[in-house]
Amino acid sequence: MPRTHAIEDYRNFGIMAHIDAGKTTTTERILYYTGKSHKIGEVHEGAATMDWMEQEQERGITITSAATTCFWRDKRLNIIDTPGHVDFTIEVERSLRVLDGAVCVLDGNQGVEPQTETVWRQADKYDVPRVVFVNKMDKIGADFFKCVADIIDRVAGKPVCLQLPIGSENNFRGVIDLIKMKAIVWSGEALGANFSEEAIPADLAEQAAEYRTKLIEACVEMDDDAMTAYLDGVEPDEDTMRRLVRTAVQRRAFHPVLCGSAFKNKGVQPLLDAVVDYLPSPADRGEIKGIDYKTEEEVVRRPSDAEPFSMLAFKIMDDPHVGTITFCRIYSGKVESGANLLNSTRDKRERVGRMLLMHANNREDIKEAYAGDIVALAGLKDTRTGDTLCDPTKAVILEKMEFPEPVIEIAVEPKSKADQEKLGIALSKLAAEDPSFRVSTDPESGQTILKGMGELHLDIKVDILKRTYKVEANIGQPQVAYREKLTRRTEIDYTHKKQTGGTGQFARVKLVVEPNEPGAGYAFESKIVGGAVPKEYVPGVEKGLNSVLTAGILAGFPVVDIKVELIDGAYHEVDSSALAFEIASRAALREALQKGGSVLLEPVMKVEVVTPEDYTGSVIGDLNSRRGQIQGQDMRGNANVINAMVPLANMFGYVNQLRSFTQGRANFTMQFDHYEEVPRGEAEKVVAKYA
């Protein structure tokens, strides 16, 4: 099937915001007005089209980014709905990587909220042009102008109003279009309510004139001819204004601001017009850089069907009907179902089975896809998030995505053997879908350990295990990954002798054990000369050492950064064996760790708290009570940014406590920084708990 829309007529955009700003409702209205969805889904009824996982519908939050295609004014819109919760920023990050533009939705009452800041910074990182939609203008306390000021103060944005609200709270009835200089008024709140263009109300005429002047002045900055004409007293006409706003958005010179109430069906159609008029097409975004698979030199791929094929996998989902679905953004060339592609990131061949166009969780089979398309592929075996798929004859590796390290872990124990099997399958699927979620096995207890970005992140994963995969399991409390370390050099001479009737056991080892450089890990060297310990027994020595190093001597945690030298020993012709040397070295190392002053190490997190100034004292006091060390603070807009180093053990439950004592106005990020010795009093508690 040939291309139905020119690449210039595509708009690949995401809807991003803080949790509860009305992002999913806005998307639902867009789908309704573009004719894709004939029954509107309300989030608070748990029926939104884009929120199709049970966990999302219950919690009223969006967890996975669903992709959907719709049409407006003969343009093809590919929308990615993204989550707004801090534990799911990975979803936002990977959506932004493949978008050309974004609509940032603000809650008219709350303005720029913590997660808005995070998402805005991520959009800056990927240079994503955006327009702002101030939603919930019908809410008590909604303040359009405070929201505009927030964009300047809190995210250093450059807002320029394209609309002003008419009325507020319960009396919100429409908007003033500053380009047309007309009032757009909706006749009711019902779905598909009609709107009419009217003269601007007299009481708002002066304000409208003032903001139109600001808009014109921002626009003419984009074009020398328009600036010259304006200085000569000629204002740009409507078409010129739209062209100049479009230029400004593409250059990220300013951020156009619109307003409305998605829930009350006001302001959605003008928002769709703004997406079409101002957000870039793939052609506007231009070429993408990559690395040539063979020569490793930089190459470019232009957004054209004639270029060699390349696309990026940005999300993997498990679908009960189709199996694994891989969401991909095509940057260049075209692809047909059945095509053989190269996964250049992993050097694996992949065959495209079914190719699907997604609408939330409905799907439509397609045979061909082109540059600019966002498609879902079924049947890929080895592809993971962030991988490049391309034409094997012109292979390229596109820029990879960066994923943060998990900071929290819980143990999971299946209740039966059948659950054990289901758990294995489910976890491998979940880990493939989400790169910030890791799975490992504890070598001592054999328990399965889940690692993630935060408590809600792991809660949702456990919920999916229980509901979607029907795994019955016991879930442990969140745990800290402690380590043990030797503090001083020590020498041990140990003899293992056991005589029972028949063959006995005999082995003597002399070890020098000392701390290694931080991060250097474990090193073993045999310095035996003259056969004091025969070569065939040295692996037995190493096996004994390893068994102690994996579990330490204090509380069952691995020993890190240690050097062991075998410098002497003795054996017996009849009674010595590899097993005897294993037992001797195990006992020798345990003794060395005791004599050498083993200590516990704990992970220390780099924590950044962004808080309104009123709460700074409370935040610092609370961090100090968690054994935190304040590293410094500075202002960001009107918020205070506090940097601290805090042991992970003291950060469990922090997100909820921070929210409660700052009324949800502070937010924080944390990532692993280094391991540090646990103070003696704390270490005694840890040993008592785990030993």
Swiss-Prot record:
**Ranges of residues in domain tr-type G:** 8-283
- Domain of life, per UniProt, equals Bacteria
Which Pfam families did the record assign? EF-G_D2 (PF22042), EFG_C (PF00679), EFG_III (PF14492), EFG_IV (PF03764), GTP_EFTU (PF00009)
Presence of the UniProt keyword Metal-binding in the record: no
Locate the residues binding GTP: 17-24, 81-85, 135-138
Gene Ontology process terms (BP): ribosome disassembly
Q: Where in the cell is it found?
A: Cytoplasm
The principal location of this protein is cytoplasm
Alphabetically ordered keywords of this record: Cytoplasm, Elongation factor, GTP-binding, Nucleotide-binding, Protein biosynthesis
GO CC terms in record: cytoplasm
PROSITE patterns, per this entry? G_TR_1, G_TR_2
User: Is Thylakoid tagged as a keyword?
Assistant: no
Q: Which GO terms describe its molecular function?
A: GTP binding; GTPase activity; translation elongation factor activity
PANTHER family under this entry? RIBOSOME-RELEASING FACTOR 2, MITOCHONDRIAL (PTHR43261:SF1), TRANSLATION ELONGATION FACTOR G-RELATED (PTHR43261)
Task: Name the job this protein performs.
Answer: Catalyzes the GTP-dependent ribosomal translocation step during translation elongation. During this step, the ribosome changes from the pre-translocational (PRE) to the post-translocational (POST) state as the newly formed A-site-bound peptidyl-tRNA and P-site-bound deacylated tRNA move to the P and E sites, respectively. Catalyzes the coordinated movement of the two tRNA molecules, the mRNA and conformational changes in the ribosome.
Family (UniProt): Belongs to the TRAFAC class translation factor GTPase superfamily. Classic translation factor GTPase family. EF-G/EF-2 subfamily.
Write the protein's name: Elongation factor G
